[in-house]
Amino acid sequence: MKKLLIGCLILLTSACQSTTPTPTPSLFPTSTPPPTPIPATASPEPSSTPEPSPTPFPRLFTEEFDGSLAGWVILQAGNDGVPNIKTEGSRLILQMDFPYIWLYALYGPEDYANIRIDAQFENRALTPSSAGLLCRYSEESGWFEYNVSADGTYNVLYGRWLSVGVAEYLPITDGTSRKIQPSGATQKIGLTCSDSTLWLYVNETLIRQVDVSSYELTEGKVGLAASSFENTPIVIGFDSITISEP
């Protein structure tokens, strides 16, 4: 209907034009100008909830092996037989079913110069075997290793890798101590690496100080050690390890 009225109005206006044309009123009321269109923008996608940052690994701590071994690295020398490594009953269990295996559990996130390491463990083997501690471990330069055996002996070694899975051990010192308990007993060992001296502890008693000034190891990682000899199986359970200032 609106189209028809507009057509009639145009015809009448053309036929009756005067010299000064009268402005034609608008057929539609004056409307408010349409708003300036806003450029289309992509709808924002829903943002995902940020995941919490992982807890940084501590530098000084006590590990009681209640959970995973995150931050720890397992290395093996000697026999390439696969060991059984697990956490069970708040213990790190290192089981070696093959002879002449040296196992290491290294704490990877940190390097230390002067540091003290203490561990509590149980040697369940009825045959010769050892448990120990490491300090100043470097894949390129080597490490210091302190071991105690169920027969009452101990030693300190300088170890270094010759190739993958093949290590060389140079004896620094050895001895015996009545403080070392037989197999089946829970006991503690401690090692302080301070400048050019190693301090050896058994059941919280200092048994020896060792001069290592001739070895150019200034800092590195720390860790635990376990080894089997000619008879197997060997099972060593670490209850805890404490890393502290010397």
Stretches with model-predicted labels:
Residues 185-199:
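Localized edge beta-strand/strand-to-loop motifs within extracellular or lumenal beta-rich domains
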